Design a protein with these regions (language model features):
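Accessory alpha-helical/coil subdomains and C-terminal extensions
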Residues: 2, 7-11, 28-38, 151-236, ...
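ATP/nucleoside-binding phosphotransfer catalytic cores, i.e., glycine-rich phosphate-binding loops
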Residues: 241-331
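Short Gly/Thr/Asp-enriched flexible loops that form oxyanion-binding sites at enzyme active sites
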Residues: 82-104, 241-249, 277
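Internal gly/pro-rich beta-alpha loop/helix module
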Residues: 108-178
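Short glycine/serine/threonine-rich phosphate/pyrophosphate-binding segments
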Residues: 15-16, 87-92, 122-126, 239-240
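Short, acidic/small-residue loops that bind anionic groups at enzyme active sites
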Residues: 92-121, 130-136, 253-263
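ATP/NTP phosphate-donor binding region
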Residues: 1-70, 267
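Short acidic, glycine/serine/threonine-rich loops at helix termini
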Residues: 17-20, 92-93, 118-121, 151-157, ...
Length: 331
């Protein structure tokens, strides 16, 4: 019988109604009591490192999860993390970069409704996660939700209330789960290196979302205070005329800053070579592109890069474009 470590962190799945709204209050042991069918499937040990609404999750919490998995890695066959849905995609992406080459599954799940309600998706999601974690072919960081298995770097929350809350962006679902049966769409990739854990992140990253007519007034402060700036642009990517000149001047003033372009559009990614607003600035400002990476993956990968990689731009560029847990297939 396989041994699975259950890591409860709060979220809607573990919430109860209070006069101020839903609040995480259900313990890890209580969560497990709602899915007795997994008792004969595996031997489960539960831990509860923190208990948060996922809107309050910060990078330090990701480091805590890495430490928990690292501490228990040799003692368990897999890991199931119960997490809130609002920042689940960020956590899954972050753990994909912080725990690499894991031959053991690290499954993240949650729910749109608390597990103690009569009508809820929580029981199925949690049960599916344990079945997936116990399967011999499972590995790496994945999200299991609404019967779908999504690579940790490809998930995006696309619905606020419906059970099918997450989509896999520009990449197939890895598998589907129905009635405890797993149908795999893609074979898992063999890892050539042993598992590696990274506990350091830098949160000195700013996401600049462009709007029509955006003012450049805050750009100097952003460039001064942040080590990396992710520009969430329109369409395939570019710098609009309203901020083009000051943006270029600041890039020249702060050549050590890491500038990355991503797109506000969910599907099909960026390509700054298409339009004049992108082509020239990409070269002049030495901008990296997200291509088909999600904003969640770009943000957390940048945090990981700043926390663990050399300061020179060439090394960071090479690491940024290296595929990790299916985060990019751009050629």
């Amino acid at each position: 019988m396989k041994k699975i470590l259950f890591i409860a962190t709060g979220g809607t799945i573990a919430s109860k109604k209070t006069e101020n709204g839903l609040t995480p209050q259900i313990t890890s042991e209580e969560l497990l009591s709602y899915i007795p069918e997994v008792e004969g499937l595996c031997e489960i040990t539960a831990v509860h490192p923190f208990n948060l609404d996922s809107s309050n999750v910060v990078p330090e919490n990701w480091s805590t999860l890495v430490k928990v998995v690292k501490e228990h890695y040799e003692d368990f066959d897999g890991f199931v993390i119960a997490h809130g849905t609002d920042t689940m995609a960020y956590t899954a992406a972050a753990l994909s970069y912080m725990i690499q080459n894991s031959e053991k599954p690290i499954v993240i799940t949650g729910a749109q409704r608390p597990i103690n309600l009569d009508i809820t998706d929580a029981k199925t999601n949690l049960s599916d996660s344990f079945y997936y974690a116990c399967d011999d072919a499972s590995q790496g960081v994945q999200i299991v939700f609404d019967g779908k298995v999504i690579a940790g770097t490809r998930a995006k929350k696309v619905r606020t209330k419906s059970y099918n809350a997450f989509s896999s962006i520009d990449f197939p679902y890895l598998a589907v789960i129905q009635d405890s049966r797993i149908l795999r769409y893609l074979p898992m990739l063999p890892y050539e290196k042993p598992v590696r854990f990274y506990e350091n992140l830098s949160d000195n990253v700013f996401l600049l979302k462009l709007i029509p007519g955006i003012s450049p007034v805050l750009l100097p402060a952003i460039f001064e205070h942040y080590d990396a700036i992710i520009v969430e642009s329109f369409g395939v990517g570019g710098i609009p005329a309203s901020i083009k000149e000051p943006f270029y001047e600041l890039c020249q003033k702060y050549p050590e800053k890491l500038i990355i372009m991503c797109t506000q559009v969910s599907h099909e990614g960026s390509d700054m070579t298409v339009y004049e607003v992108g082509h020239e600035m990409k070269t002049l400002c030495n901008i990296l592109e997200s291509y088909d990476m999600t904003p969640e993956a770009v943000t957390t990968k940048t945090m990981w890069l700043l926390g663990n990689r050399p300061d020179d731009h060439e090394s960071r560029e090479k690491a940024f474009y290296k595929p990790i847990n299916y985060d990019t297939v751009w050629k």
